[in-house]
Amino acid sequence: MAKPYDPKDFYYRKAKKQGLRARSAFKIEEILHRHRLLGRGDAVLDLGAAPGGFLQILAEAVGEKGVAVGVDLEPIRNLGKRWVRTAIVDLLAPDALDKIRLLHDGRFRLVTSDMAPKTIGIKVTDEARSLELVRMALSVAEQVLVPGGAFVAKVFMGGDFPALKRELQGRFAAMHVIRPEAVRESSYEVYVLGTGFRGRAAAVAPAAVKAEAPRAPAPPEQAAAPEEATAPATRAARQKPAPAKKPAAAKRPAARKRAAKKPARRA
């Protein structure tokens, strides 16, 4: 049986001692240490940023020449750094991207998400809701990442997790599953990391290829397309003799001759 969550565990106390807002700060710190995702002057977007644990580490990583944007449904207390910008944003709202672009009108080198659903204790349901949040974050990332950028998101591993991995593999050059040391022993959360973003067009292509791959007759269908394209020309070629119905025109004079002969007989 899993150990009950102790809010005052080692990482909780360590975070408080270092002035960090949440123990999650150590998770993103470890990921950044293991993978070079950000540099000074870069722009980073943190989704579900409250209370600001991730954002504190990300802001330090990009420095004062960079931009760190954090959005959440809850207000995020000011970090006291001019290059950190926050806002209350509902990612499901149609104007979510517009609000994000008001904070930074360029693209981002990294998009992170530490969002988690309100768990109800039913593992299958919690996993499904977690996957929904990751896919929502990924949808935002696809629209704001620079080519070659990276995506990090927390997810409860299980259920449809293999499908999520395939989605990430189709969108990024490399995909990793990371379990930072700061994750509670009883938790089944991990972080997925995609690096080398290929762009939105590439994100659609792999899925299309997989959908078409099982169709063995696909090449013949492609060959049939030109035939359909040329079919009207063939029909037109067959119809070319139609205007030249000169035999009918030739019969008309004959009919006139017969009509002319009739009066002669009467005479």
UniProtKB/Swiss-Prot annotation:
<feature type="binding site">
    <location>
        <position position="52"/>
    </location>
    <ligand>
        <name>S-adenosyl-L-methionine</name>
    </ligand>
</feature>
<comment type="function">
    <text>Specifically methylates the uridine in position 2552 of 23S rRNA at the 2'-O position of the ribose in the fully assembled 50S ribosomal subunit.</text>
</comment>
<keyword id="KW-0808">Transferase</keyword>
<dbReference type="InterPro" id="IPR015507">
    <property type="entry name" value="rRNA-MeTfrase_E"/>
</dbReference>
<feature type="binding site">
    <location>
        <position position="72"/>
    </location>
    <ligand>
        <name>S-adenosyl-L-methionine</name>
    </ligand>
</feature>
<feature type="active site" description="Proton acceptor">
    <location>
        <position position="154"/>
    </location>
</feature>
<dbReference type="GO" id="GO:0005737">
    <property type="term" value="C:cytoplasm"/>
</dbReference>
<feature type="binding site">
    <location>
        <position position="54"/>
    </location>
    <ligand>
        <name>S-adenosyl-L-methionine</name>
    </ligand>
</feature>
<feature type="compositionally biased region" description="Low complexity">
    <location>
        <begin position="212"/>
        <end position="252"/>
    </location>
</feature>
<dbReference type="InterPro" id="IPR050082">
    <property type="entry name" value="RNA_methyltr_RlmE"/>
</dbReference>
<dbReference type="InterPro" id="IPR029063">
    <property type="entry name" value="SAM-dependent_MTases_sf"/>
</dbReference>
<feature type="compositionally biased region" description="Basic residues">
    <location>
        <begin position="253"/>
        <end position="267"/>
    </location>
</feature>
<keyword id="KW-0963">Cytoplasm</keyword>
<keyword id="KW-0698">rRNA processing</keyword>
<keyword id="KW-0949">S-adenosyl-L-methionine</keyword>
<comment type="similarity">
    <text>Belongs to the class I-like SAM-binding methyltransferase superfamily. RNA methyltransferase RlmE family.</text>
</comment>
<feature type="region of interest" description="Disordered">
    <location>
        <begin position="212"/>
        <end position="267"/>
    </location>
</feature>
<dbReference type="InterPro" id="IPR002877">
    <property type="entry name" value="RNA_MeTrfase_FtsJ_dom"/>
</dbReference>
<dbReference type="GO" id="GO:0008650">
    <property type="term" value="F:rRNA (uridine-2'-O-)-methyltransferase activity"/>
</dbReference>
<feature type="binding site">
    <location>
        <position position="90"/>
    </location>
    <ligand>
        <name>S-adenosyl-L-methionine</name>
    </ligand>
</feature>
<dbReference type="Pfam" id="PF01728">
    <property type="entry name" value="FtsJ"/>
</dbReference>
<feature type="binding site">
    <location>
        <position position="114"/>
    </location>
    <ligand>
        <name>S-adenosyl-L-methionine</name>
    </ligand>
</feature>
<keyword id="KW-0489">Methyltransferase</keyword>
<protein>
    <recommendedName>
        <fullName>Ribosomal RNA large subunit methyltransferase E</fullName>
        <ecNumber>2.1.1.166</ecNumber>
    </recommendedName>
</protein>
